[in-house]
Swiss-Prot record:
Protein name in the entry: Octanoyltransferase LipM
Record-annotated active site: 146
HAMAP family: LipM
Enzyme Commission no: 2.3.1.181
Subunit organization: Monomer.
SUPFAM superfamilies per the UniProt record, alphabetical: Class II aaRS and biotin synthetases
Length: 274
């Protein structure tokens, strides 16, 4: 595996911009213009994202989202609804030839960096087992959100999911991104979702709490975004033997990201397509 990577901290940005930047990095890396990239980012305003195969209108209460001043966007990856609020988000972009293996194998390798980041914080995390493909569309409606079910090789603390990831591949480039929960407001999350009929919200929230956790809960103290960023950067470097060189988006990446916001991620013909 290539071990010289670029490290990006792009701060907190709107949802469409975050997804556009991930895609722009993948395009630039595919052209050989930038090295493999580990990016950390946040969301401002907080936003709901849905997986590529989901229905925005079927999953999200857009009236509640807009009333709260939140954003919304469809991801280029699969998986289920996430409310990006009190979290650290990461993305990894690397060509398939530089990180050989199928989806599960590369997912496991990237998860080694995440697991080491947890160790940097003192969180006793472990990787989930099983063979559930991270690209799978959401299962039945009883699974309400990303963090109530773990895919293979996702991070758990005491059997409860603390980070969720998804991967896609295009033109020989791997893009994997995921959310690491610093904390969570479960009632707020459920107010922004369309819930299955006939199942009380209280029951679904209880299930969610039983299956998910946060860094704050695991450590018994708040964890800042910057503290988590630094810990996971150190974890990736240590576990994968990387040399991480801090950098910035190139001018072309910035321009292509803006074009993608205007033509794709900021548009209803993408976000409402299903």
């Amino acid at each position: 595996m290539e071990t010289n990577w670029r490290l990006l901290d792009t701060g907190h940005r709107p949802g469409p911009e975050n997804m556009a930047i991930d895609e722009a990095i993948a395009m630039a890396h595919g052209r050989g213009e930038v090295p493999p990239t580990l990016r950390f980012y946040g969301w401002n305003p907080p936003a709901v994202s849905i997986g590529y195969f989901q229905s925005m209108l079927g999953e999200v209460d857009l009236d509640a989202v807009r009333a709260g001043g939140y954003g919304y966007v469809r991801r280029p990856t699969g998986g289920r609804l996430i409310f990006h609020h009190m979290e650290l988000t990461y993305s990894v972009v690397i060509r398939e030839e530089l990180l050989p293996g199928g989806v599960i194998e590369t997912y496991r390798e990237i998860s080694r960096g995440l697991l080491a980041g947890m160790a940097e914080l003192g969180v006793p995390a472990a990787l989930s087992g099983g063979d559930r493909d991270p690209r799978r569309a959401d299962p039945d409606g009883f699974h309400t959100a990303c963090f109530d079910t773990a895919s293979a090789y996702e991070l758990q603390v005491g059997g409860r999911k603390v980070a969720g990831s998804a991967q896609t591949r295009r033109d020989g480039v791997i893009l994997q991104h995921g959310s690491i929960l610093l904390d969570i407001d479960v009632p707020l999350l459920f107010r922004l979702m369309r819930l299955p009929e006939g199942i009380p919200a209280e029951r679904l929230m209880a299930r969610f709490r039983a299956k998910s956790t946060t860094l704050a809960e695991a450590l018994g103290r708040p964890v800042s975004w910057a503290e988590a960023r630094d810990a996971f950067a150190a974890g990736f470097a240590r576990a994968l033997g990387l040399t991480l060189t801090p950098g910035q988006l190139t001018e072309r990446e910035e321009k292509e990201a803006q074009t993608l916001v205007e033509a794709k991620y900021g548009c209803d013909n993408w976000n409402m397509r299903k």
